[in-house]
């Protein structure tokens, strides 16, 4: 948290939503391939399982929790041979410890997207994730039989923890659009805004509110097109159409 805070949480979360919209592999975010963006999904797991559900040493009397149990599992099992195997195994480990099917979350973050690249970060290393390995992990997670989280986990931020605790419905406000810039006024309980094209593919995603305020403004990198739609997304993932 301190590291993310030093970079400006608002900026990191803004770039995070662009990464999810692009569907990029976790090890290859293009212009956003810095360690701070890559840290976001790990922090989101702590926000949800730790701060929302209380599975943290700060709240458990036995000083256990989601991440302590993940670390203990990794400590007591043999290391896998490659970085790609380790990255994908993390999906299984987290689902096992959380007792939740986290495939959707990790898919959106690109952990289960094929990639074959050389990563240069304190030295170079190979990151290869094959479709066969992805299929194996998916099968193993599904075999656990755990339910999916009842929240839009990929959109949780430090500012929306209370939303994810209480899971209130969206209260619609008003919205205006000027070119590719959107201004949302007096919307409440919004975890994120999504702009999708006519096929339903995400074009742009924005934090519901980066800081407590009655107004949220965001700008797409692409031009607005006929057929685009905007949705306000609640903590549960329920979507409310935004009209202008």
Where are these regions (language model features)?
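Single conserved hydrophobic/aromatic residue that forms the stacking wall/gate
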Residues: 2-13
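Active-site-proximal alpha-helical
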Residues: 14-118, 122, 127-130
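Beta/coil-rich, acidic/histidine-enriched accessory regions frequently appended to metallopeptidases
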Residues: 82-244
